[in-house]
Curated annotation (Swiss-Prot):
A Pfam family recorded for this sequence: AlaE
Its biological purpose: Exports L-alanine.
Gene name, Swiss-Prot/TrEMBL: alaE
Keyword tRNA processing included in the entry's annotation: no
Source organism per UniProt: Salmonella typhimurium (strain LT2 / SGSC1412 / ATCC 700720)
Predominant cellular place of this UniProt entry's protein: membrane
Bilayer-crossing regions: 16-36, 46-66, 83-105, 115-135
Highest taxon in the source lineage: Bacteria
Protein name (record): L-alanine exporter AlaE
Classification lineage: Bacteria, Pseudomonadati, Pseudomonadota, Gammaproteobacteria, Enterobacterales
Length: 149
């Protein structure tokens, strides 16, 4: 339907990855670490889906820029992982705060959720990067399909 070089194909892959990953990981954080009720977390995730759809491709472009800088600094695997964490935390935390404010979370819940998300992102930011790369290969985005196939 779309060529492997298609920007739309790239955007769809990035959107799929962000919606799936953020829905699962953030719901677990909100319920088990932040003390939000299931209903609050579900509301947060439902609000987050359209937000994630809007920010997924810009985040992918932002991440790719940070990855290029990291590759120039060091080709080592730790540099990629560090760049993934940095990209994820610096882009997602402000968005997450806005989502939580929108669904009526209290400041203590927001601080707990965002702080927990930052800590978890130190582990999971790199995991999201690998998941995003996997989704790009799955959707046959040209630079990922050819380079990693």
């Amino acid at each position: 339907m779309f060529s492997p070089q298609s920007r739309l194909r790239h955007a769809v892959a990035d959107t799929f990855a962000m919606v799936v990953y953020c829905s699962v990981v953030n719901m677990l954080i909100e319920i088990f670490l932040s003390g939000m009720s299931f209903e609050q977390s579900l509301s947060s995730r439902l609000v987050a889906i359209p937000v994630n759809i809007l920010i997924a491709w810009p985040y992918g472009v932002y991440r790719d820029l940070i990855m290029r800088v990291a590759r120039k600094a060091s080709p080592a695997g730790w540099a990629k992982n560090l760049a993934d964490v940095l990209a994820y935390v610096t882009f997602q935390s402000p968005v997450y705060i806005i989502i939580l404010l929108t669904v009526g979370a209290g400041w203590h819940q927001i601080v707990a959720a965002v702080s927990s998300n930052i800590v978890v992102s130190m582990l999971m930011g790199a995991v999201y990067g690998y998941f995003l790369d996997y989704c790009r290969r799955l959707f046959k985005v040209s630079s990922y399909h050819q380079a990693k196939a």
